[in-house]
């Protein structure tokens, strides 16, 4: 494939050090650490200690202490002499600074929203005071606590009537208020667990008023959440999927955080260009199969080539063995023997398949295939959607050199870099789909159609998820798009859309596959095609950097240190 990918600025002279895959006593210290690491370790420990001590969700006391520690470490980081840091340490500085600023912003948002919801939790300070004295085991005034709990119950009943008259509460405020009520409920539960049965007067006075207050707090939290209204309110369009579109401004904010210098509209344009390439290649494969330009008929034929029930694990292992042998033969990457030895298999439950209709991976390879108690049509859709030709594109995505190798490497190289981003996680796994296509891994037209199906799917993910979040498409339109434009089985398309919008994933998660993959492919063109490293050196080095935005991996690979006040500017795609 000819990728329309460039980097938009001239390369600087770079001295790139290729590290050995496994550490040895002679290995440079920077293989595992940097000057910024020391601060990061201290921050993580301090933040954790405070979070575990001040446990009440959204409480002012907790927020004040966390704001204090974040600001303290922002100032500590500024005291480092940035100019004297090496490139890897500068990358750590830039990303850690970004994370601290984001943490600060999140806490400030929490404070702003909390001030707007205090009318719904007028009893909060009473509970905070009860919880605070419990921390050091003060002798409780059982009768006083019982009186306070009784008053809280009365207050909640009054608030429930007030809430019933509300037409709605902005989703962010409803979510914050509900979480705060649940936090207060947990605080009371901790007090009750600590004293009840141990302190005689507490045990005599408190149980009945506590149980009433506890029950009402749970009901009240749910009632508040039920009143949430979105800026872009969603009704059930028949799909049963009701998510929360975040809007263009939030998407752009997220893209800046992930160091992606493109707008949502530009990313959709990238997806459409990649889709057009897939269309051309799909027609070629369809003709080679004897179906002419009727690529959907060719796709249907490929779907019928599923393996019988009970044989999917064996078929997947065969594909895994082929992909690992191919990567070795072409000297694309080093695999530690332990990484090959210790990945595991399991079968996905029918319930999990509603959200993940295809297999998932990592150290545990979870196989999606029908069980005996599934409906007949669901069985066939699962088998058709997980046929070996489709899976040829994704077994290496989930195992080696994809997610399983990522998990293996992340626990062994620069483990302090917990800069998790789907553009690294999913981008790397998708990159291997692109690379193995270019290297000739698909053997037959059926293999090509299977791999193209998944590449079209990655393009479609960008298009449907961004159109949904900017308010253009409904979930049902997204499902129909996957069925009509990509050729998905309808049940699989529904599962994919459900997973995207109500599965707890970041709004940019589905975008990250193809965009992250294209970023890495662009870097490969600079580093490998440019003669700076071999494939094996490039891929081994990439894994040793651990998770971070791809632009920062590139800075390390090319020894091009980022500026202290960094702003993403690395354009990697030519329109």
Residue locations for each model-derived region?
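Bacterial Sec-dependent N-terminal signal peptides
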Residues: 1-27
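N-terminal maturation segment of proteins
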Residues: 21-575
